[in-house]
UniProtKB/Swiss-Prot annotation:
Organism, as annotated: Methanocaldococcus jannaschii (strain ATCC 43067 / DSM 2661 / JAL-1 / JCM 10045 / NBRC 100440)
Residue intervals of the CBS domain: 226-281, 281-335
Cofactor(s) essential for the protein: Zn(2+)
Subunit structure comment from the entry: Monomer.
Keyword match Repeat: yes
Catalytic residues as annotated in Swiss-Prot or TrEMBL: 55
Protein name, as recorded: Zinc metalloprotease MJ0392
InterPro entries recorded: CBS_dom, CBS_dom_sf, Peptidase_M50, UCP006404_Pept_M50_CBS
Function: A site-2 regulated intramembrane protease (S2P) that cleaves type-2 transmembrane proteins within their membrane-spanning domains; its endogenous substrate is unknown. Regulated intramembrane proteolysis (RIP) occurs when an extracytoplasmic signal triggers a concerted proteolytic cascade to transmit information and elicit cellular responses.
Record's cofactor remark: Binds 1 zinc ion per subunit.
Alphabetical keyword list: CBS domain, Cell membrane, Hydrolase, Membrane, Metal-binding, Metalloprotease, Protease, Repeat, Transmembrane, Transmembrane helix, Zinc
UniProt binding sites for Zn(2+): 54, 58, 148
Enzyme class: hydrolase
Length: 339
């Protein structure tokens, strides 16, 4: 289900509103009407125009490095430019671009507001918007993930400490900052601050884990981590025979092979009755090749416990989540011992 609405395109990039943004906008407009003041509704809309320009700053520079931009998504807590993986050599410039746009908007509006401003319900619109843009640029320069400053810090540190270690440093700063924000949010009962702290914490954690997995599993293919020559069952095996087979081999899931070809898979969760055969309960297997990379394997394993490695029509191996965790532990240790 799609939870966003497309508005228009700028530089070929779709601009979309998340449904929560629309609900939040309705609340802001409702409160403005109740208070007989449209200032906050107008300010809110103009602020998110500024957020779009901020994200377009990132996107413009990213496109210069050949990065594909899927869309810019507007959320109540800000905007997100959804793009392909940023090349390491362009991360510094791409990270700076957004805050730079915000600072330029803020400074220009601040200068203009000294000579001309729009007063709504006694509030200076341009002056207030200029300060919010300066705050937006400054907040994003905080050297912690998932803010732009975290990416800028990583780009600078990676020249000395390497990409993975620099990511962990920036992520740890981000999580520490988030815990401080959460503490202040709880003490002051500030819901917005609590939500922002959670966003920062989990954003930093996710960035760290993604980079860690990509670094550790770099150049690792399915054939490197699979369990080769797995035991298998046949489709005509009775359920009673299958349960005895499971008890003997101690795995929860098995490939189903017929005439030398993989035709299905079956696990303990597929069995509901003792009657019938394996053919009656088996599922369609999720298949990869020997040269499938870890990123694609993890994507395919999002909704299954195991994938089957097939080459030339023949079953070569099986990769379970246990295999992934085992390989990760070993590769993490190898990475640590390098240091």
């Amino acid at each position: 289900m799609n939870y966003s609405i497309r508005l228009f395109k700028i530089m070929g990039i779709p601009i979309e509103l998340h449904i929560t943004f629309i609900l939040f906008l309705v609340v802001i407009i409702g409160l403005s009407i109740m208070n007989n003041s449209i200032f906050w509704a107008v300010l809110f809309i103009l602020l998110f125009v500024s957020v779009v320009l901020h994200e377009l700053g990132h996107s413009y520079v990213a496109k210069k490095y050949g990065v594909k931009i899927e869309k810019i998504l507007l959320l109540p807590i800000g905007g997100v430019a959804m793009m392909d993986k940023i090349p390491k050599e362009g991360e510094l410039r791409i990270g700076i671009a957004g805050p730079l746009v915000s600072f330029i908007i803020g400074i220009v509006l601040l200068i203009v507001s000294q000579f001309f401003d729009i007063n709504i319900n006694g509030y200076p619109l341009l002056y207030t918007l200029s300060l919010l843009n300066l705050m937006l640029g400054g907040f994003n320069l905080i050297p912690a993930f998932p803010m732009d400053g975290g990416r800028i810090l990583r780009a600078i540190l990676s020249k000395k400490y390497g990409y993975l270690k620099s990511t962990k440093i920036a992520a740890n700063i981000g999580k520490s900052l988030a815990l401080i924000m959460l503490l202040f949010g709880l003490l002051s009962m500030n819901i917005i601050l609590i939500l922002v702290s959670l966003f920062v914490y989990f954003g930093a954690e996710q960035e760290s884990r993604v980079v860690e997995v990509e670094t550790i599993f770099k150049n690792i293919k399915a054939k490197d981590i699979m369990t080769p020559n797995p035991v298998y069952v046949t489709p005509d095996m009775s359920i009673e025979e299958f349960l005895d087979f499971m008890l003997k081999h101690k795995y929860f899931g098995y490939p189903v092979v017929e005439n030398g070809k993989l035709v299905g898979c079956i696990g303990i969760g597929n069995i509901h009755k003792k009657e019938g055969t394996v053919r009656d309960y088996m599922e369609k297997p999720v298949v990869v090749s020997e040269d499938t990379d870890i990123k694609e394997i993890l994507r395919k394993m999002a909704n299954t416990d195991r994938v089957f490695v097939v080459e030339g029509g023949k079953l070569k191996g099986i990769i379970s989540k246990t295999d992934i965790l085992r390989a990760m532990s070993i590769l993490e240790l190898k990475e640590e011992l390098k240091d």
